Amino acid sequence: MAKGGFPGFGGNINNLVKQAQKMQRDMERVQEELKEKTVEASAGGGAVTVVATGRKDIKEITIKPEVVDPDDVEMLQDLILAAVNEALRKADEMVTAEISKITGGLGGIPGLF
């Protein structure tokens, strides 16, 4: 075996370890940043708007008064569900984009978020 390395690791395991440690620090930083970053989604032409963080916490739900109809609560529920699901999908996309900046597009790393 070559000095300072293992076969298949480009000859220097120390560089690989340093890169992994940097990636871990970067991931921790991104996790903290995602607590503050938000995405917004709406349904019903803006009748219901939802704001979620990158950690998938719902921060705000706004409902326009004109869509509140006591005789059609089901429609309002559907609008809220659609807006929340869209906000969570956008949060997932944001997380994926942030992670790919760190991993260089190597794909998702299971269990990070």
From Swiss-Prot:
Disulfide bonds: none annotated. InterPro entries: YbaB-like_sf, YbaB/EbfC. Keywords: Cytoplasm, DNA-binding. GO terms for molecular function: DNA binding. It is found in: Cytoplasm, Nucleoid. It holds the Pfam family YbaB_DNA_bd. GO terms for cellular component: bacterial nucleoid; cytosol. NCBIfam families: DNA_YbaB_EbfC (TIGR00103). Homodimer. PANTHER family: NUCLEOID-ASSOCIATED PROTEIN YBAB. Belongs to the YbaB/EbfC family. Binds to DNA and alters its conformation. May be involved in regulation of gene expression, nucleoid organization and DNA protection. This is Nucleoid-associated protein Cthe_2143. It comes from Acetivibrio thermocellus (strain ATCC 27405 / DSM 1237 / JCM 9322 / NBRC 103400 / NCIMB 10682 / NRRL B-4536 / VPI 7372) (Clostridium thermocellum).
